């Protein structure tokens, strides 16, 4: 028996079903089911009655839940006391991030950080990667989320990888059928005029020895997606910059894959407060893959 199993039991009873508990705890439904099954196996009793109307505690489950809630309260008290010692109560964490990471990468990690360190307030600045670097240099933020690699003045950690995809009108090419460079060279492209992305796409395209026909250069990713939907051209964007992708647009893999690495950075020469290391622990312990569908 462990704290996580007790937290899951309490969440299932509170929400009334496994799927809602999974959503509340940011877990998969199968992980919730496995945790409850393991707890029941260990105790040798059925704690929850499952049915069409959800999950409800059995008679023994109600008694176990009362004790579990007391244990969870004691656990929270222990965490609170330890955080007081670490300086994580009443602290403040300042984060800078570029837009797609702030939208898709940061929220689940912030949610976990808030669970672990509820006494730390967080502020977020959204800017481009160069702006993230400058904010770190000037001491305006503690941690930055930005594409890697960066210069040696920063200590960095990889968080996830983001595939560049070809965006075409949904009727232009069958989904799942590979694209060739020769096929792509027939399209006019709406180029993503944004920091390192432009350079990465141009350099990658150059390896194909095909002409890149640029019809527009646009900085706003959502504008590019809308233009592709209207048949004004094709585009190559990091997937996280492209989502949500409307039905009129289809995302295809490049003939040769291209990824960007998204990571966290701190200024190597700066003295860091405890909340920075606590957040870095969350980043390191979080699964390294971010999936964005659409």
UniProtKB/Swiss-Prot annotation:
The keyword Transcription applies. InterPro entries: HTH-type_LysR_regulators, LysR_subst-bd, Tscrpt_reg_HTH_LysR, WH-like_DNA-bd_sf, WH_DNA-bd_sf. SUPFAM superfamilies: Periplasmic binding protein-like II, Winged helix' DNA-binding domain. Keywords: DNA-binding, Transcription, Transcription regulation. Pfam families: HTH_1, LysR_substrate. Residues 1-58 form the HTH lysR-type domain. This is Probable HTH-type transcriptional regulator LrrA. It comes from Synechococcus elongatus (strain ATCC 33912 / PCC 7942 / FACHB-805) (Anacystis nidulans R2).
């Amino acid at each position: 028996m462990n704290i996580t199993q007790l937290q899951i039991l309490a969440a299932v009873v509170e929400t009334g079903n496994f799927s809602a508990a999974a959503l509340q705890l940011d877990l998969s439904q199968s992980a919730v089911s496995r945790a409850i099954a393991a707890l029941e196996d260990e105790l040798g009793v059925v704690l929850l009655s499952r049915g069409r109307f959800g999950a409800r505690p059995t008679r023994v489950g109600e008694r176990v839940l009362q004790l579990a809630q007391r244990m969870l309260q004691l656990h929270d008290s222990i965490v609170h006391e330890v955080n007081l010692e670490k300086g994580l109560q009443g602290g403040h964490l300042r984060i800078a991030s570029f837009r797609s990471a702030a939208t898709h990468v940061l929220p689940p990690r912030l949610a976990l950080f808030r669970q672990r360190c509820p006494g730390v307030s967080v502020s977020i600045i959204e800017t481009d990667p160069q702006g993230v670097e400058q904010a770190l240099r000037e001491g305006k933020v503690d941690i930055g989320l930005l594409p890697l690699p960066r210069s040696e003045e920063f200590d960095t950690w990889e968080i996830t990888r983001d595939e560049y995809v070809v965006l075409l009108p949904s009727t232009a090419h069958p989904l799942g059928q590979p694209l060739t460079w020769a096929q792509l060279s027939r399209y006019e492209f709406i180029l993503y005029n944004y920091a390192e992305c432009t350079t990465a796409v141009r350099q990658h395209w150059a390896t194909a020895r095909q002409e890149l026909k640029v019809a527009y250069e646009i900085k706003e990713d959502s504008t590019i997606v809308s233009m592709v939907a209207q048949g004004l051209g094709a585009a190559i964007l990091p997937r996280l910059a492209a989502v949500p992708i409307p039905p009129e647009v289809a995302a295809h893999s490049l003939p040769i894959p291209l990824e960007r690495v998204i990571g966290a950075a701190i200024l190597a020469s700066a003295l860091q407060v405890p909340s920075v290391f606590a957040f870095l622990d969350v980043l390191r312990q979080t699964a390294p893959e971010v999936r964005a569908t659409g």
